[in-house]
């Protein structure tokens, strides 16, 4: 069965996480995972997906940052669920606040990804969006209030209610779906707060990618899981 | 409380339903509603919304065809929930297959419309989309497989399972939400089939708007409700 | 021939410019136009377009805020070029920064509007976008750097080069196309600066719509044309 | 200076052109280029871009299928101009009919790609769109009437006027910009017809990707250049 890692690092389009930097960051994730025994997920850019899978695919959960609602065939510039599978990745994020989807496309691609055996994590901005996303029965919903993304002000402390409420409403519509939270998560105490609110894990980006020492930052985050 | 009319006629952008034609069609709906005692809903184009409300606003349920996820203020070319209220309309369609929305925008505008007291009907292409739409707790979800829209092949006969399944999954996530079905509905037997499958009503367009005799067409549809 | 008014007021979705307020503001524009002999353009919300045309259609140039790339027929929630004509309006804005269009849709709708005899004004964010918009040969291109919209810092003073350069490049690709500028325009001196840079007029919104005395504000703007 | 290859093969999302198949097709292109001395361009999927560059980057022109209007940083699921450069690719398609862009985004990304030294080819559906695309001064505009894509009915024979007219209007606004044509191109005679109409080359996809013998298909296409 597909497990949702309790810490997922979204590389976004940061220069610090493209090409050689993507591989370096991927190895950091693999080291930390091995040292701590905690499953770590990473989301490299599309162009680095294959290389990252080759480098650390056996050690961490590798996710695409997005997949398009497109079947194989005459589609230009799209990343299909089949391409992600073929590249050897384990899953994908969908509907990130920087890549919102039409409800109908999200529904199609969510179903296609689940059918392809991909770990499917749908992002949502608040509890009501999380409820709708949860109704598609993905493996996880990641609640990220866009106004907190990249701020260093953690959702789990700044807006605990959105986390608690999201856990509650997602379970109402899809009991098996995990709930992650994200936005502003930077250290272990933010993670601990998230878990205490009922979240199954966290989705982070700049807190690790832009950290002076990404390994230390990731270890610190994971310390909050204990 | 807001009631969902069992028959709603979407005027779309048909020349037969713009301007004077919109008013004529609106009066037909009002006559039929009075003669049969059945509540009828109509969805005129944005530019005709006010005139139609003035003409028949006391006799039928007047709905906008769409509303944008926009608050009053510096937004150009948008129709806000507040404008629809101010125009005196009763509600709106959202996410029609010809006007799909981002999940996040749909969530925002659905919440805003409900808060404004507007009858809020969210369209969906299949049962899974209906479940996600239902999770937003609108007054109704209208299931319309796009491939049947405008064909004259009624969803309630061509794909009964999508109707049954939609009723089932919408109730799972929002018991109070009504379920309509649409696409290809043209006569009373199509409506009867829909109701027997558990639908609370139908959403029609070309079947009435393009009929030789729209009044007769509408009366025929309503005969299927008995 | 269609003339481009040297001052066009975009009502946007401001509560101050919807319903009765739209009519009041429209009458202000008509009065000012009559008193000064200067043609004024106004862009009411879709739902007020017909009423505004009825009220002042003979006295001012009434423009839709946007038109969709849609032909009459099975299109829901769209405003077609034909609807704008049928409502009696004179033209439309297209591609406003709050309602950006796909290049291909813009091309289709621009051509359709021109063919329908509508005064067609395409917005653009900078000189390069103005050049591409101009290549479609609309009646006017309105250059509005989005970062200055609604700020009260006039483009004609804060970024004179974008105005001059836009005039130059639009003429390169379409000699007949007028060039307006907008964003932050609030008084006559801003208009004068625009005209001195080669602009044929201005596109304003909050500077008039939100003014304590819209008539005075509009008169002041027009004083800059002399 | 960047040269526009006279034959460019878009791999799209065909299963026949992903992963190992992408590499195989890339080697075919390299062989044909070497044997004929004609520069060939290929557009692999995002996830295969790096591997294809490693395999044949010195022998053929490798282009991304699309680039997003995004700068490095907090952007999820996007392919930035910088990523394409970093992956070692030579350029990109933009605005393909299966991946249309907002005019404003196209303008931003077109400028960014040119600034990054990427060979920038903007697709357009007809002569008017080609004129607007040309106004952005990309290295090439590729005219592809969407209704002919994938049909095997070549634009250069079915609609010669759109090719001639596109060449004419693109040169009006940007003399240095090359004009390619595409849609339905399958053999050398289609290419010859295109060149006789003034086109600088062709953009093909299924005609090569889905051919029983892609090498033979590509050689046949190139024979039309003589």
UniProtKB/Swiss-Prot annotation, chains A, B, C, D:
The active site is at residues 96, 144. Its main location: cytoplasm. The keyword Cytoplasm applies. It catalyses: D-glyceraldehyde 3-phosphate = dihydroxyacetone phosphate. It is an enzyme of class 5 (isomerase). CDD domains: TIM. Pfam families: TIM. It is found in: Cytoplasm. Substrate binds at residues 10-12, 149, 184, 205-206. GO terms for biological process: gluconeogenesis; glyceraldehyde-3-phosphate biosynthetic process; glycerol catabolic process; glycolytic process. Involved in the gluconeogenesis. Catalyzes stereospecifically the conversion of dihydroxyacetone phosphate (DHAP) to D-glyceraldehyde-3-phosphate (G3P). This is Triosephosphate isomerase. It comes from Methanopyrus kandleri (strain AV19 / DSM 6324 / JCM 9639 / NBRC 100938). The lineage of its organism: Archaea, Methanobacteriati, Methanobacteriota, Methanomada group, Methanopyri.
């Amino acid at each position: 069965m597909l497990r949702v890692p309790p810490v997922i690092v979204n590389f976004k389009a940061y220069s610090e996480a493209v090409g050689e930097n993507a591989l370096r960051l991927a190895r950091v994730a693999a080291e930390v995972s091995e040292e701590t025994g905690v499953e770590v997920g990473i989301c490299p850019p599309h162009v680095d997906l294959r290389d990252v899978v080759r480098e650390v695919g056996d050690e961490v959960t590798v996710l695409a940052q997005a997949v398009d609602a497109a079947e194989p065939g005459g589609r230009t510039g799209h990343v299909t669920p089949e391409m992600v599978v073929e590249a050897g990745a384990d899953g994908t994020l969908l509907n990130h606040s920087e890549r919102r989807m039409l409800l109908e496309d999200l529904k199609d691609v969510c179903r296609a990804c689940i059918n392809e055996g991909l770990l499917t994590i749908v992002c949502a901005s608040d509890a009501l969006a999380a409820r709708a996303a949860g109704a598609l029965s993905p493996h996880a919903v990641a609640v990220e209030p866009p106004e907190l993304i990249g701020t260093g002000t953690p959702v789990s402390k700044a807006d605990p209610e959105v986390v608690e409420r999201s856990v509650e409403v997602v379970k109402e519509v899809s009991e098996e779906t995990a709930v992650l939270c994200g936005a502003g998560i930077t250290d272990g105490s933010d993670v601990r707060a998230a878990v205490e609110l009922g979240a199954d894990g966290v989705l982070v980006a700049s807190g690790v990618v832009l950290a002076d020492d990404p390994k230390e930052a990731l270890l610190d985050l994971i310390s909050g899981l204990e």
